[in-house]
Each structure stands twice: as C-alpha cells, then as structure tokens.
Amino acid sequence: MKNENKMMKNLGSTLKLGAAFERLSFFVLVLLLLCHFVGCLWIFVGRTIGEGDSWIESGGFEDYTIMELYTVSTYFTMTTITTVGYGDISGTTTVEKVICIFLHLIGVISYSFATGSLTSIIANYDSMNDKN
C-alpha cells in the first residue's frame, strides 16, 4: 500500500496536481481491486454456496467458462458499485442478497467520496486560476 501511495504522490507532483487528485486516483485503484475481489467472490458464492438456484443458474450461465463468468461477475459488481445497476443480474439466494446489500453500501459510499473529491479538485483548480 505504501508503494502505491508513493507512486500516486509522485504522479501528482509530476503532473502538478493536488492532494484531491491523488486521493481520487488512489480511490479508483482501490475500487478496481475491490471489483476484482468481489467479482471472484460472486463466482465462488454462485458456484458453491446456495440453497437453490444461484445467480449462475437463474441467469443461464451454467455453460460459461471461468473467464466468461469472471467477465459477467465483474460487470455485475461494477454496475452495482457505480449505482448504475441494470438489474439483469441479481442475487437469488440469501447469501447472494447479503453480498448485494454490501455492494450497495459500498456504492453509496464510493459515489459520495468521488463526488466530494471531484468537487474539491474543481474548487482547487478554480482558486488556482483566480490567483494567476
């Protein structure tokens, strides 16, 4: 984590960007890693834990390869966390629904953080332009 943070700080100082941009860049990196891990968890739960038809069976994904399942699960995770949530894939078992609740909470928090960071970047940029 420390090396990634140093990398973001070096990038920010090289590009003459503020701390808000560094935080936002680090946040995007963490969000992408989170989508990967939750996507893998979503596959694991769909294939192993279930008291009935999982999202894999209910969506007709039984014959998909592991890479196709990874793509579908990462798509689901990304659309849920970014609050787009098309609804074409959803949790059907209790465990899957609990994971969806967790993803919804992460989505609200990440959306709020991203909005605040972008507002800070724009405000700092505007104040820097006013000084020049």
Predicted features along the sequence, with ranges:
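A conserved hydrophobic secondary-structure block that centers on an alpha-helix together
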Residues: 1, 7-20
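Pore domain of cation channels
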Residues: 1-2, 22-39, 60-131
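Interhelical loop segments of eukaryotic multi-pass membrane proteins
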Residues: 8-11, 46-61, 127-131
